[in-house]
Structures are given as structure tokens and as C-alpha cells.
Amino acid sequence: MSAAETGPIASGSAVSTGQRGVSRVLAKLSQSLAGGEFYEAHMMYRTLYFRYTAQKRYQDCLELLFDGAQQLIAKEQESSAADLCLLLVDTLEKRGPQAEDTDNFLWVPRLGALIRGLNSATVERETLIQRTIKWSTALHGQYGHPVLHKLIAHVFWTEGNIESARHHYLLCQDGSLCGRVLIEISQSRGFQGEMDLFLVQAVLQQLSLKDRKTAEDTFTEYTRYHAKLLKHEFPYKEPLVNFLYFLFRLIDAKRVAGFRALRKLYDPSLKRDTSFLKYVAKIGVLYFDEHPEAAHSGPPGLGGMFGDIFNRLMAGFEEDDADDHDTTLRRQNENNELE
């Protein structure tokens, strides 16, 4: 028999042997889980991960790791479960986005459920959250999938980690929900004179992230239902709330002169928080074609993932606008006619 004839036979034999090997490992894996040998089970999951990914059997690998992580979480083996979760994200990255959007989205709630199942004391959980968000940017923009942010926000909120929850709620593109969350935070943690600050910071951040619709939905929910605001419709008693009201309308009208006048008029109020003027400067670049200012390190108090997002926003002023410099100058000349 020629080599050409024996080649396919040899290849088929190797595949068959490999499948038998996987079957044996799966059988031992079930026994280890049933017998409480969780470290051994963890190692076998890793072995199967390497075999499946080497064979590009990504779907089999994903289902195996998801099931394994769930089982280990149920057995309170959270460190091992977190490791499988990280391998699952790694497999999703190796596989890449699929043509079927429904399959891509399937893993957003699944990963959210796994994150929810891990205790906050699990060391690897923060790494898992960051890796999962990074993976989801391939599905939805540079800040990650909004549904994933909502699921993560719920986890932090349930644990009482209000600041981390707030950051993720701001990125979930659900302004009504964000407004309700901010109301609860301000009523439980803020003083009467700070009721407007919670709203203003959130709305300016959302506008800086080019999420105008969510920003206005947040504004509407907060001003309509916050019990301690002195008025619930324009004109408001709080100067900064009026500032936001005017800002939305100037963005829609693209009135550069009006924006500059508004910023000057409310400058004393904006100085109540050092971050506000930096956000307003970014908004000027995004919506009114103003020159970017020098890069900032970001306002104090924005740590973690959202702080990184803010730093990328602010540091990207000059770099992002370099290619569009001539266009910006032309637009500014046109806008000068409005002054």
C-alpha cells in the first residue's frame, strides 16, 4: 500500500486514539468530582482545555469549562473555578467572534453568572472581570458590552461595593436604571447640598464617553424622581442642574458660542468639583470642535477600570485629533460666524 493510501488511515487512527484519550480523561474527571478530588479534577479540566484548543474544538472546550466552573463553584472551590473561567475567556479569544451574533451574546450572560457565583474574596475575580470586559469589546465598542456592565454592576451593588457598582452602571447604557441607582446613592450617602453633584458627575462622564442618550435619560430619571430636589422641572433651584439642562440643548443645536458662554457663566459652580471642568473640556472637543487641552491624569477618586477609561479619554485628546486638525480648524472658522 502506498504512502498516499496509508496517510489518511494513519491520520484517522490518530484522531480515533485522541478521542479515546479524551473519553478516558472525561470518565476520570467525573469520578474525581463525585469523589471530592477537586484538585485532581481541576488539573484534568486544564488537560482537556489544552487538548481541545490544540484541536480547535472551541465549542466543546467552552461547554466543558463552563460546566466545570459551575460545578466547582457549587462545591465552593472558587479559586479553581476562577481559573477555569479565565481559560474560558482565553478560549473565546482564541475562537474569535462568530458569524452568528446570538452565539457571541450567549456568553455575555453566562460569564456574568460565573462572576456572580464567585465570592468577592476570590483573588482572581477582578482579573476575570477585566479580561471579560476586554473580550466583550470585540462585540460592542471600546468600553465593553453594556449588558455585561449591568450584570457586573448588580454583583457589586449586591455586595455593597457602591463605587464599583456606580462605575459599571454608568457604562450599561440604561439611563433610567442609572438615574434610579444615583438617587439611592445620593439619599443614603449624600448631604442635602450635594444632591446635584451625584447627577452632574454621572451625566458629564456619560457625555464624555459619547453616550448622549443615556446621559439625558439619566438626567430625566434623576430630576423627575429624586424626592429631595427642590424642583422637578426647569428652571431648577440647583445651578448645576440648570447647567446640564442648557448643555443638552446646546449640544443639539451645536452652538459653540453658547457653549462657551454657558461654561463661563457657570464656572464658579463647576469649580465645586475639580473633575467637572475636565469633563466639560472633553465635551467641548467632542461636541463643539474645540481644541483639546493637554492630557490629564484624570480626576481624583476614579480608580480601577473606570479610571483607566477616563485616563484613555483625556490622554487621547491630542493623539485622536491630530489627523483631523485641518477639519477642526475649518469647522471652527464656520462656527465663529455664530459669535
UniProtKB/Swiss-Prot annotation:
One GO biological-process annotation of the entry reads: protein insertion into ER membrane
State a GO cellular component annotated for this protein.
BAT3 complex
State the superkingdom. Eukaryota
Q: Give the transmembrane region(s).
A: none
InterPro entries (UniProt xref)? GET4, TPR-like_helical_dom_sf
Instruction: Name the Pfam families for this protein.
Output: GET4 (PF04190)
User: Which family is it part of?
Assistant: Belongs to the GET4 family.
Q: Please explain the role this protein plays, according to its UniProt record.
A: May play a role in insertion of tail-anchored proteins into the endoplasmic reticulum membrane.
Q: What is this protein called?
A: Golgi to ER traffic protein 4 homolog
